[in-house]
Amino acid sequence: MNRRNLLKASMALAAYGSVSASGLYAARALAAAADGEIEHFDFAELQAHAKKLAGKGYVSNKQVLPPVLANMTPLQFNAIRYDPNHSLWKDVNGQLDVHFFHVGMGFKTPVRMYSVDPQNKQAREVHFRHDLFNYESSGIDKNLVKGDLGFAGFKLFKAPEIAINDVVSFLGASYFRAVDSNKQYGLSARGLAIDSYAKRQEEFPDFTKFWFETPDKNATRFVVYALLDSPSATGAYRFDIDCQAGQVVMEIDAHINARTDIQQLGISPMTSMFSCGTHERRMCDTIHPQIHDSDRLSMWRGNGEWICRPLNNPAKPQFSAFADKDPKGFGLVQSDHEFSSYQDTVVWYSRRPSLWVEPITAWGEGEVSLLELPTTGETMDNIVVFWTPKTPVKAGDSLNYGYKLFWSPLPPVSTPLAQVHATRSGMGGFLEGWAPGEHYPKTWARRFAVDFNGGGLDRLPEGTGIEPIVTVSHGKVQDFNILVLPDIKGYRITFDWVPDSDSVDPVEMRMFIRTGDRTLSETWMYQYFPPALDKRKYP
């Protein structure tokens, strides 16, 4: 602790006078890194402030960074390390701690951080200062970094890896992410999405302020509050973050206020990357069989139906909407965690978490929205998923959404029915077991193979009739095969899609399997993009 902090700590303790033991403890915790003036804070006041702010014009607080920060490389940015000796709760010496990110590169919006005593609801700001960071490995002359620049974001740590491996990160706009038992970051969540696929440019709201409740020594949950601001909306958020051994669970209370009419409001948005997988090989001319952070969108609809929608890397942007009422959950899933499926020893796609949303308030009518963008590499996120309310959002509207986020290898819930294990696609029009080269089919077709397992498929009596129920938006399906797959204790359904016109419109496919009147599986949904007429031929 430097002299400035020591002096402020002494003044703060004197100001408390005859406070309780818990009050003295909290005062010491606040003084560890927080050096601002004491302010009152509670969530109700934050909600009121956000609502009042929405009634005023938007004022951007992006700052012009000094060239030494604005022109940093990613390597330099990552080399600036927060000094763990100045961590927010260093003096607590407990199970939890917080470090902050330096501003720089594209992270130009100053984010203000506050430490809160939950006992007396007093808060103090943590101001940016040089001694909070180590610049030695970055090549940055800290003497050129002047003024209170704020922070770019923060990361959370939990014992026994405090100051070693962070488990949650908030950085840039309203983006945040977490790890699971595999200790590997993957897809991201956001506080709010605005006009992701609308007639006007997408808007990226910012979390501009955060408040951290000082925990007790033995506490294992973070409580964080946030103020969100953008040209079209404001928001007050409460995050209850439980970093468990196998997953991170966040309970979120979001209060959103519209400044303007919003064409497309995205609640609980998540962003991921899908380049290629078992069914999509267009961008996979590498040694890696698959490249993706997530391979499917999974939905548990309000009526109880489970849907699996494999992701695509389309040639042009595609938007899909799945209407629902009071959804039970949805998320982007990384279903395959086998190293052999990726052969990646650098970014470890086999270790990427899934992200599942569980509404805990009534969300009403709306749709799960899926935006798939073309990407030529693995460094660009191209998948966006969010909930859009059915009722148009008008200026002055206030909305409240409560939900949980589960960052885990697989979602915490699953259907009791059989699930989609994998989807594959390739040349059609021939018998299984035939290899191309000797001759080619006369009629062009596209073959699909969908594997199902679980749900007791391996316990069905011998001779049970399995019937695939398939519908397509155009074209026709034929040449069905039902194959037993002992290795996955399930079944493979293959069929060919044959065009009935020269249309290149996407084909919306839907399938489940049943025996008699009994449904055996979740619903597989897929979007296929037929080639142009002159491409529908074999060599």
Swiss-Prot record:
<dbReference type="InterPro" id="IPR006311">
    <property type="entry name" value="TAT_signal"/>
</dbReference>
<dbReference type="InterPro" id="IPR011013">
    <property type="entry name" value="Gal_mutarotase_sf_dom"/>
</dbReference>
<dbReference type="Pfam" id="PF04349">
    <property type="entry name" value="MdoG"/>
</dbReference>
<dbReference type="InterPro" id="IPR023724">
    <property type="entry name" value="Glucan_biosyn_MdoD"/>
</dbReference>
<dbReference type="GO" id="GO:0030246">
    <property type="term" value="F:carbohydrate binding"/>
</dbReference>
<dbReference type="InterPro" id="IPR013783">
    <property type="entry name" value="Ig-like_fold"/>
</dbReference>
<keyword id="KW-0574">Periplasm</keyword>
<comment type="pathway">
    <text>Glycan metabolism; osmoregulated periplasmic glucan (OPG) biosynthesis.</text>
</comment>
<comment type="function">
    <text>Probably involved in the control of the structural glucose backbone of osmoregulated periplasmic glucans (OPGs).</text>
</comment>
<dbReference type="InterPro" id="IPR014438">
    <property type="entry name" value="Glucan_biosyn_MdoG/MdoD"/>
</dbReference>
<protein>
    <recommendedName>
        <fullName>Glucans biosynthesis protein D</fullName>
    </recommendedName>
</protein>
<comment type="similarity">
    <text>Belongs to the OpgD/OpgG family.</text>
</comment>
<dbReference type="GO" id="GO:0003824">
    <property type="term" value="F:catalytic activity"/>
</dbReference>
<keyword id="KW-0732">Signal</keyword>
<dbReference type="GO" id="GO:0051274">
    <property type="term" value="P:beta-glucan biosynthetic process"/>
</dbReference>
<dbReference type="GO" id="GO:0030288">
    <property type="term" value="C:outer membrane-bounded periplasmic space"/>
</dbReference>
<dbReference type="InterPro" id="IPR014718">
    <property type="entry name" value="GH-type_carb-bd"/>
</dbReference>
<dbReference type="InterPro" id="IPR007444">
    <property type="entry name" value="Glucan_biosyn_MdoG_C"/>
</dbReference>
<dbReference type="InterPro" id="IPR014756">
    <property type="entry name" value="Ig_E-set"/>
</dbReference>
<feature type="signal peptide" description="Tat-type signal">
    <location>
        <begin position="1"/>
        <end position="29"/>
    </location>
</feature>
